[in-house]
Amino acid sequence: MKIPLKWLKEYLPTDIQPAELAERMTMAGTEVAVLNSHKDKWPNVYVGQIMEVNRHPNADRLVLVKVDWGQGQETVVTGAPNCKVGDKVVFARTGAVLIDGHNGKEIVLKPAVLRGVESCGMVCSERELGLSDEHEGILVLPADALVGMLASEYLGEVILDLELTPNRGDLMCVTGVARELGALIDRLPAISDPDFKATGPDIKEKIEIEINNSKLCTRYTASLIEGIKLGESPDWLKERLIACGMRPINNVVDATNYVMLEFGQPLHAFDYDQIKSRHIIVRPAAEGEVLTTLDGVERKLSPDMLLITEPDRIIALAGVMGGENTEVTEKTSRILLESATFDKQSIRKTARGLKLQSEASARFEKGLSYELAPIALKRATQLILEIAGGQAASGLIDVLPNKKERNGIVLSLAKVNQILGYEKEPPDACKIAKRLGFIWLPEYVPGMEEFGYGATEDMVRIYPGYWRMDIETDIDMIEEVARIAGYHTIPCLPLDKAIPKIETPPLPGMKRFLRQILSGYGFQELISYSFTSREMLSRVSSGAEPEFLAISNPMSSEQEVMRTSLRPSLYASLAANRRFEKDGLRLYELGRVYLPKENKKQEEPEMLCAVIAGGSSQSRWQRNTAGFDFFDVKGIVESMVSRLGLSADFVVSDEHGLSHGYQAGILVGDMPVGILGQVSPQTADKFDITEPVYMFEINLSKLITRAMVRRKFNPINRFPAVERDLALVIDRHITNRQVIDILSEYDLVKNAELFDMYQGKQIAENKKSLAYHLLFQSDTHTLKDEEVDGVMSQILGRLNTETGAVLRS
């Protein structure tokens, strides 16, 4: 938000230097930078004075102007009709950077010979300086302009550039900044209630206003001005609009923009003669309605948008932009001026839904008090009468369906000191409230003493100004006390107790640990948007149409739904990065997915998904060209889960998107927590992946419930272990997991590890050989061979009964 300092001083006269002023406001919570509106512009451009004006010897429409620019005199050839001896003008020397009056592009001024006469410079118009589109004549400066001064210094103005926080919509205008600065320097700004002289008929005879939804439009005020003359605004008004970053258009539109910058209330002018019905209705849009706005674009409307209409047609998008059908044009002689208060959520949805952000919508989105509407309307009417002429109808249209009484905020002065930490000489909260323009009264609240907030005489009721919509509770008011008194006045006190130890929540702690583990395994983390497209998710979904959580106002078609899986972003990233990575690539992502449910709620589990592709070794000397396989990713999962203090088991699975026979479900205890396997060629092809890719996916929201189980300490076994090897011939369809499950049921078997598998000529065609290394150990005594032999016999018998396995000879 840009505010000219001269304009600000009209409401709050002060001798404070701009840098100090900016420092005070910055330290009070609003960052301010001091700018010069024309600093570093117009090199070699000076204030000059016309000494002579002579006719051009070879051209009737050109004149020779001799200009004194403080360091000498130069002769300039110009066709400007308003050159007079003694006038102060803007003189540009050779090398100056100006705007070409014909095409609007920047040019570097060079020496020129015009009709046989050398021109050493230029006397400039407003357009050539970039101040406006005016180029019919040169810019004539006031008589007090100092000859020889740089034009950037003379025409420049100190501008305050405010970086506003979302809650301070009141600072989006000059009067709001004046109130803020006035509170900081303890001086009330001179802001009076405007009014205008009405000489026309009663406005109620000319127009009828109706509000159909008082929640979306809390107040609608309007005035009528007849006999206006549309034209260019005066220079002072145009200069202020330009300094604030706005483009002058015509005197009526400029007046509404000026008042918006002055008071913060957006206004809109309708061509009254185009409102044929003389009846305005404020209502929500109906499905399928359209409106051509002032920018000439036909816009499709939705029911959550608020409209200004006649009974049979739409004439404006409330709070955002007017309609082309009631636009003020050169033929306009009567205008209806609107100043209304619209619901901020409604305006935000409309502006974003139509991608139509404006200065007006930005102010409505922050929230405006309905008390501001008639004040700004009177000021705008007054200004238009001043610069565009005409007669104002008597009175105002003021539709206020539900007037709300302000209850004020009950504040304990003791609580102010308690919250801010003052012990001696605390700031006077009542005086600060007065400096802010608020009203305060003594308050009696029975029973507050028992809460430690002070006796009856300690309580006050504060009524914030209507412009401070962000002051709602006593804590808000306490913040104002700290801001205005100065944060530097709050005493620094030593801690009176130890800082409590806050334990890291289990899930964030697990995620941090997993990042460390995966980083050690050579993985790189991917962070993608939670928003994605239906098309992207459908690539990893089964044939049935999947359900998604749709976003009501997506930024683009590629971010229209919430993700239900991390796989698409990982596969797409893998495909994009494999072109630049010759060795193996390992990627993972930690994040939530959003799963819709029938009861219109949703699950948001925290997931870990990882992919690996390429060579399994990056060591150049090793020259290992073997690629990753199923057992690599299985080993990573086993090791990772083991480092969490858990044990992973694997079961046969049939997950869509993974190759049949090269996938497995992940169990921790008896709980399914994830899946791993090779990405199917069909799915890989959808992401333009041409090589084998392996992945694993784990539901951390489930895994954490197992990791949180407190584990008991087991002492180191002091009895020796006995090792045996067991080679079995077994049917090919029997899995290693089935054998391991049987072996693990025997207490003396502490570990069983598959170390060999064979299929070949020496074994029947439908059989295979599995060889296991078994570790036997007792917790209470040293095992004897007879005891181990007995357990081995039991194992062989059970394996034979349940799987048909026999001991390999």
UniProtKB/Swiss-Prot annotation:
Its EC number is 6.1.1.20. Keywords: Aminoacyl-tRNA synthetase, ATP-binding, Cytoplasm, Ligase, Magnesium, Metal-binding, Nucleotide-binding, Protein biosynthesis, RNA-binding, tRNA-binding. Residues 39-152 form the tRNA-binding domain. GO terms for molecular function: ATP binding; magnesium ion binding; phenylalanine-tRNA ligase activity; tRNA binding. The keyword Signal does not apply. Residues 404-492 form the B5 domain. InterPro entries: aa-tRNA-synth_II/BPL/LPL (IPR045864), B3/B4_tRNA-bd (IPR005146), DNA-bd_dom_put_sf (IPR009061), Fdx_antiC-bd (IPR005121), Fdx_antiC-bd_sf (IPR036690), NA-bd_OB-fold (IPR012340), Phe-tRNA-ligase_IIc_bsu (IPR045060), Phe-tRNA-ligase_IIc_bsu_bact (IPR004532). GO terms for biological process: phenylalanyl-tRNA aminoacylation. Gene3D superfamilies: 3.30.56.10, Bira Bifunctional Protein, Domain 2, Ferrodoxin-fold anticodon-binding domain, Nucleic acid-binding proteins, Phenylalanyl-trna Synthetase, Chain B, domain 3. Tetramer of two alpha and two beta subunits. This is Phenylalanine--tRNA ligase beta subunit. It comes from Dehalococcoides mccartyi (strain CBDB1). The gene is pheT.
